Amino acid sequence: MNRKPIPTRIALAAAIALLQLGAAHAQTAPATTDQSAPAQPQANDGLKLDQVVVTGTSTKLSKMKQSVSISTLDPEQIEHSGATSTAELLRLIPGVRSESSGGEGNANVTVRGVPISAGGSRYVQFQEDGLPVLLFGDIAFGTADQFVRADYNIDRLEVIRGGSASTLATNSPGGIINFISKTGEEAGGAFGLTVGANPREFRLDADYGGRLGPKTTFHVGGFQRIGEGGRPTGFNAENGGQIRANVTQQLDNGYVRLYLKALDDRTPTFLPVPVTVSNGQINTIPGIDPRTAFFITPSLARDVTLNKDGGFTTSNPHDGLRVKSTAVGAEGSFKLGDGWTVDEKFRKSVNSGRFMGLFPSDNGANGTATSFTGVLFNTSLDNFDNLFNEIKLNKALTLGDGKATVTGGLFNGVQNVAETWFWNTYKFTLNGIGAQVVNAAGAPTSAPIGDGFTTFGGCCVRSWDVQYTQLAPFVAATYEIAGLNLDASLRRDIQKASGYTVSGNATTRTWDPATQKIVNYKVSHTSYSIGANYALTRDLSLFARTSEGVSFSADRLLYGNPLDGSVPISLNKVTQTEGGAKWRSGSLNVFATLFNARTDESNFEVTTQKFTSNKYSANGLELETSWYVGSFHVAGGGTYTNAKITASNDPTTEGKKPRRQADFTWQLTPGYSIGNVDIGAAIIGTTKSFGDDQNTITMPGFTVVNPYVSYQFNPKTSIMLAANNVFNALGYTEIEGDGHAARAVNGRTWRATLKYQF
């Protein structure tokens, strides 16, 4: 079937038109404020409660005035976090559950007891500068975080939980994670050289921004790296980088900005490793350390798979997670007079890649054998291109003694999802480092013991090419009077899907036309959010909100019920109620939120080949604090979650805790400055959780400590030594339901960074 490409010419024409519109309005008046230039917080405002929020809200107000739970991280906090991936960085945010054990991508991310029933971030949208990275967060082997890299380009990270995320973005009823770029408003830049040992790593970061003219700013930055990755892989499993740039033209009535992004990166994929379970407790197998084990060794350098065209392709498993993304975009904001403003954003991205990682299909006879069997998840991300556009029209007016804002907007998106699966089966020696591929007799080889036509009973020789079109009109209204802020919003999401799926035939050893199924359906839903914030004083605000939203599924539906429009399409719905307080006294800041989240979902899980239908309920408390005293500062947070499965197509799980959901998670980031020396740490912990919905396997609680020490040679030059998981904690984040394989966070690593700022 021929797929319709996303119209690049239309995207470029829109960019040119936007620039021409901006040029027509260019004068010499002062520049207006845009999303990348928020109000500056006070020096003692550790939680940045006075900072203007632009993510998941209809009006640009400070955190203190918004009726949402939102956290921000600035470049210094990111640098001191010790995080080696986006997923690790998100563990610093209260309310966010980020399973950061998969490497640079393919992370499992959710919020507030909303379940992780498969992979990815089904209920949370990843954004770059206010537009989604991908339309769906839980595409198997192609999650949104795979296409995001944290580097010197980031001005700040905004993370909203619950709130109006359900109505001001698509597929985001749980929250929004927005990476906001520097735009050159502050002139300067930096070079950073990072060297890692055990495992080996070399990375160069650079950025620079400033003025091209009185009303024109720019910023450009990126990174390049090579090394083993987060574990001792024995080869350069990490190899690639990105460059991002933007230029902004300020106008008398707004601004116009153009964006560019080019990402080409290879990183290792860390999947579960063989373990055993005894009396509900996880045990390691001699020779396999879950913190360092990696089975894609030099003995496995070639894998032959069926491609989407029916031929065979040879790929190198050493490439691990390979992603390519080229994106161009534009945004503008214009004051039209008489209280009217219009905001426009669009981005066209060309995305592709390949996911390769080894998944154990057994544990070597409970560790008593000399080898185990593993399936090489070799999945081609054939086409993940997308085009997103959002336009908003705002009207500010006076109503009585108060101020009101009415917003109407339209989001339009096109997302291609095309993948090809072909998973060969290999046998490996039971060695966590330096494992050898062997044949059925145990002799060294490089060949599989079974091809994709027989793996998992031949279920998973699959290819599909589906295009999803999203249309979402939305409206929002706010009213502010005497310290009271009220807001309400509605969103109507309409999704159309068209394309096909096909499966392989073991006899003909190619795609079987008889298995081809047409995808052609339409699904829609209306979401709402209502909130209020009341400022009792300048330093104390109370807020409350109720909201409901949905996340539409993409590939998770493809091999279940018919998708030709003949049967209803299942939705994943989240309803949240929350209330809390924001308070500060001197340099002490506190942000506390009580929440209730109810989830109704259907799901397909790749590794178990099971369809599930569950309902969940979670009550809890988020707490975020910050305190400065002299040269000492500390920020921290904690999340208590009481979650349970309230209904299920498997009645044995009803009333049980959702798998991998801990009762309590916490973060602590203390720091101390003395002269030219800064010392500190990012400390992240969790209590125990269950690895399965039947609550028979316990994953112990653990704490990861990431300390750092930095020395400032002069105002421009510094060096920092940092460790990740310095105490080498063994922290499991997931386990298969039968207990044969589990995944853990990486073991201890060290890095040193020499940085020059100018």
Task: Name these PLM-found stretches.
Residues 55, 62, 70, 87-132:
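Extracytoplasmic beta-strand/coil segments of soluble accessory domains associated
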Residues 176, 180-211, 221-233, 682:
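Short strand-turn segments of transmembrane beta-barrel domains in outer membranes
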Residues 384, 403-415, 456, 462-599, ...:
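Structural signature of Gram-negative outer-membrane beta-barrels, strongest in the C-terminal barrel
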Residues 27-28, 587-600, 605, 611-694, ...:
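Gram-negative outer-membrane beta-barrel transporters
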Residues 248-250, 255-327, 354-382, 432-461, ...:
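Acidic/polar loop-and-plug regions of large Gram-negative outer-membrane beta-barrel proteins
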Residues 324-352, 376-504, 535, 584:
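Face-selective signature of the C-terminal outer-membrane beta-barrel domain
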Residues 132-161:
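Short acidic/polar hinge/loop motifs at secondary-structure boundaries
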Residues 1-83, 87-92, 328, 616, ...:
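N-terminal Sec signal peptide and the immediately downstream disordered periplasmic leader
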